[in-house]
Amino acid sequence: MKATDKKGNDIRELYFSDEFVEFYSMLQDKVKVKFEHTMDIIRTEYVLSTKFVKHLENKNLYEMRVSVNTNEYRTILFAVDNDNIILSKKVLLLNGFLKKSTKDYCKQIKIAERILK
C-alpha cells in the first residue's frame, strides 16, 4: 500500500549526507536499483517493514536494509523531526556500508553520530 498525502506527495522527504552520497556513487548499478526501491518505500509507505528499516537498539538511529544476492548493505538513518521514523516527515541518510560482521555496526554508528554533530 502506497500512502501519500491528499495532494499525492510523498509521506517522507529523504535527505543525504555527503558521506552517503559518496558511498552511493560507488555502488554498482544493480545495487543502486535496490537502494532506489528501498528509498521509495521509505518515502511512500506509512508503516515500514523491518525487512527494509529497523530501529537500532539503545540508539535514536535506524538502519535501512538492502539485500542484493548474498550481500547485505546497511545505511544508518536519522528521523529528523520525530523520535519515531513512522511519524517522521524528514529522514536523513547518514552513511552506508556493506555489512560483513556485527563489528561493522559499532564503527558505522560512531561515524553516523559524528556526522550528526
Where do the language-model regions lie?
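Basic, Lys/Arg-enriched alpha-helical interface segments
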Residues: 1-72, 82-90, 98-117
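Short, charged interaction patches at domain edges and termini
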Residues: 78
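Conserved catalytic cores of phosphodiester-cleaving nucleases, focusing on short active-site segments
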Residues: 94
